[in-house]
Amino acid sequence: MASELDGLPVIATRREEAEGFLQGLVSKSLGWARKYSLFTYPFVTACCGMEYMTMASARYDSDRFGAAMPRFSPRQADLLMVVGTVNCKQAPILQRVYEQMADPKWVMAFGVCASSGGFYDNYATVQGIDRVIPVDVYVPGCPPRPEQVLDGIMLLQKKIQNQSHKLIDRTPLPVISGGAGR
């Protein structure tokens, strides 16, 4: 494995190649594990909530896609499902919920109202939640069918699996001796 650094060839050692291989393997394993363990937090505001409940029922079984039970706190979730219309008074609340989620986090806009404001084109409605928070997957429909939502979850799973998952550096910090005890 050779690369260029200021015009001079740099040859990686076998150890560096092995570390790169292991990091890639661990990153792929993390992607595989994360894609099947989505902890959802629903932000339900409108009529699409009925289809959200249908999608979570036994007939469609969202558990087999790794998006089982909704969490009761955004701190426990990594997938925010914005279901329905968001008005201007709710936008700061939605922003706060998004900020409370732990990294990595993903957002799904559930329905036309969450994606683009729907047919509510007035001063009080946010014309798409992407004006407030970043969105990873848009699920169209008024309301979207449960099959469409499951397709959106599978699309998000592919995106999660293909992302690079950084490892946390756990090198110990140096111990500073001295102080009051000396």
Curated annotation (Swiss-Prot):
Q: Which cofactor does it need?
A: [4Fe-4S] cluster
Q: How does the entry describe its membrane topology?
A: Peripheral membrane protein
Binding note for cofactor? Binds 1 [4Fe-4S] cluster.
Please write the reaction equations for the catalytic activity of this protein: a quinone + NADH + 5 H(+)(in) = a quinol + NAD(+) + 4 H(+)(out)
A matching Pfam family: Oxidored_q6
Its name, as the record gives it, is NADH-quinone oxidoreductase subunit B
**Annotated InterPro entries:** NADH_UbQ_OxRdtase-like_20kDa (IPR006137), NADH_UQ_OxRdtase_20Kd_su (IPR006138)
The similarity annotation says: Belongs to the complex I 20 kDa subunit family.
